[in-house]
Amino acid sequence: MPPRCPALRSCSGNLRALPELPEVETIRRQLAPQLEGRMIVEVQILDPRWTRPEDPAAVQAQLRGALVERVTRAGKYLVWDLSGDRYLLMHLRMTGALLFDPDLDPPHTRVRVQLDDGHRVIYVDPRRFGTGHLVHGAPARDAYLAARIGIEPFSPEFTAEHLRRLAAGRQAPVKAFLLDQRRIAGVGNIYADEALFRAGIHPLRPAGRLSRAQLARLRDAIVDALAAGIEAKGASIDDFRHVDGARGSFQDRFLVHRRAGEPCPTCGRPIKRFVVGGRGTYVCEHCQPRPRAGSRPRAVRVRSEG
């Protein structure tokens, strides 16, 4: 019998791939036509952790009878804009998924939402890290999000100059900088690797030492990588699925992520994998030159895996 994978790892030896901006945007695009204009007639919250610290019974009562006016997204948050100036802010975290009209309740069902047209939405989450927060009023929504996420990469304000201001003075490796949701919303491990490769920047290079030209390339590469992920309807490496249970295809288009030992698509040299701060990181060190030892962030632990 093969050894079981550690609880928080996939069998490939990487930390599980969390849904990032493209995966959440894919879910939004699939759910919006089904939900917008529909009334919620029944809600069953089966896991009290989903609404913690709020009482799930109180949240259920407030959701019943609400009209879904819009389904939007902020970073990795899926936002249901409801009648009565209410907002349901959902985060899938590690293993959360939203399914539309499954024949049967899947294992690990945590929430059931019944609509007035007879359809239903099921939230499943094996690891139970996902959350659902109901807030009242746009100011409360904005404050909740502002405390947790930074700029939206597809907003007009996300320019190379804005990225320069965010990175100024920061000695952390640029990959760690990209993963900080309080600065740039929605970029996770997959799209950070893909963006850095597109920009020709090594993940260990200190964020605050990037030149203006590098920052301009990085800004464009972030947008391009995220747009490619959306076009492919997300990456289904571990748990991510569409609302009908289908898989995304971006994992078949990775340039470097999870391609250790394979040839670089640009130069043909083998892609390397590092473990940096516990995160699997993929790089072509010919196309993304490693920073000199003196310029590498001091606090970063790096383990090479070929």
Where are the language model's segments positioned?
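Phosphate/anion-contacting hairpin/loop surfaces
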Residues: 13-17, 88-198, 206
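A cross-family signal for N-terminal binding/gating loops and helix N-caps
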Residues: 14-130, 263, 279-306
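Generic detection of long, well-ordered alpha-helical segments
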Residues: 18-21, 153, 157, 211-219
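Glycine-centered secondary-structure boundary/capping sites
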Residues: 37, 65, 148-151, 200
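Basic, nucleic-acid-binding surfaces and adjacent catalytic neighborhoods in DNA/RNA-processing proteins
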Residues: 39-59, 72, 100, 108, ...
